[in-house]
Amino acid sequence: MTINYQFGDVDAHGAMIRAQAGLLEAEHQAIVRDVLAAGDFWGGAGSAACQGFITQLGRNFQVIYEQANAHGQKVQAAGNNMAQTDSAVGSSWA
């Protein structure tokens, strides 16, 4: 009986998570543009409230990016570890 695992799929999934993390920067910048365009709501684009919101938004996006990127790395590492273990075990049974 042969069991075939698709370890490449695991690696690709990890890479996709990391790529999506990278795409967050574009979303972050789009939101900042919208906030600045609605600066009157904050008391002006240069107001402390507006700038404070943008700063906090940046911190939040940074945390999300770091966590998503780290998760993607862990998924890729797990896939690689499984592939290596599978290869080692398979070799010992040959």
From Swiss-Prot:
UniProt keyword terms in alphabetical order: Secreted
Record text on subunit structure and interactions: Strongly interacts with EsxK to form a heterodimeric complex under reducing conditions.
Source species, domain of life: Bacteria
SUPFAM superfamilies: EsxAB dimer-like (SSF140453)
Family assignment from sequence similarity: Belongs to the WXG100 family. ESAT-6 subfamily.
Record-linked InterPro entries: ESAT-6-like_Myco, ESAT-6-like_sf, T7SS_ESAT-6-like
Taxonomic lineage from the root: Bacteria, Bacillati, Actinomycetota, Actinomycetes, Mycobacteriales
Protein name, as recorded: ESAT-6-like protein EsxL
Gene3D superfamilies (alphabetical): ESAT-6-like
Keyword Secreted in record: yes
GO cellular component: extracellular region
Subcellular location: Secreted
